[in-house]
């Protein structure tokens, strides 16, 4: 897991990515805990929101695992905080991968 700056050494190419953004950093940790317990996903990173108390979580795995993890994360987060956005990219394009690292640690 990467929180803040630095570059991940792990290669996530070919893995689906699930991204969710919440209004509370604490709720993000509760949600990512539920996600990682619900399915075989790796938490790629947690990025703090610049203007608020929230954060964005990126997790990687197979499409089915990322979907199950996302469902679990959102179910736990919904009563705790505002869910700004969430999405799953089943097969990120080669050029998309570097862009997902650009904001890490910013």
Short names for language-model regions:
Residues 94-106:
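Short, low-order "capping/linker" segments at domain edges
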Residues 1-7:
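Short, Lys/Arg-enriched N-terminal segments with co-localized hydrophobic residues
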Residues 60-66:
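Helix N-cap motif at beta-to-alpha junctions
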């Amino acid at each position: 897991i990467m929180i803040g700056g630095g570059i991940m050494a792990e290669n996530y190419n070919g893995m689906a990515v699930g991204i969710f953004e919440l209004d509370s950093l604490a709720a993000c940790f509760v949600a990512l805990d539920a996600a990682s317990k619900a399915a075989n996903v790796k938490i790629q990173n947690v990025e703090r929101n610049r203007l608020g108390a929230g954060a964005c979580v990126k997790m990687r795995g197979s499409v089915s695992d990322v979907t199950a993890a996302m469902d679990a994360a959102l179910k736990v987060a919904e009563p705790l905080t505002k869910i700004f956005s969430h999405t799953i990219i089943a097969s990120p394009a080669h050029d998309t991968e570097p862009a997902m690292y650009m904001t890490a640690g910013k």
